[in-house]
Amino acid sequence: MRYFLELRYNGAAYCGWQRQPDMPSVQQTLERALTTLLREKIEVTGAGRTDTGVNASYYVAHFDCEEPVPDPAQVVYKLNFLLPGDIAVGSMTPVGADAHARFAAREREYRYYIEPRKNPFTRDATWQYYVPLDMDRMNEAAAALLEYDDFTSFAKLNSNNKTNICRIMHAAWTADERGVLCFTIRADRFLRNMVRSLVGTLVDVGRGRYTPDGFREIV
């Protein structure tokens, strides 16, 4: 029997979603809790990888178990007691055997925050960067991302990606009333460390190291 889980997590204490040898991951932590609760070996498949330290406000994963779970809501209740405080499960839903958390996901969205001042309360959730940035130039460069689909320039070296092709639907910077910048990017898939690499290069545009046209040449 297959089930979808909807969850959220604070990734500060984890190497990312995917299981890694000798490193804490969200996937491994969730599998251990489910295995304990359901009393059988459980392997969980996620909608995609998230990098070290990345938070997820809405994430979907699936797992298979031998017997149907009579009360999924009760499992969610108990699961949240077993899991550490930085991982929360919102729901558990029975699905068909061919439903797949990764292959069924049509798009994924990242939000990356840059705070222009030191703030001890957001240091784990924002990049605190104190150099003034030109958001108009950064948005001009970000808009160019929709024109390309090969992001080899922003792929992690020596990764095992079968392809570096990604289709980006949206990429833009906004600022709130406190001056905190937010980069929102939505695509069908992301490469490992791709978002961080993009943000770093766009920040270089914002501080004048590259022009928007120079950014295009990098892409």
Would you name each region that the model predicts?
Residues 1-219:
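Structured-RNA-binding interfaces characteristic of tRNA pseudouridine synthases
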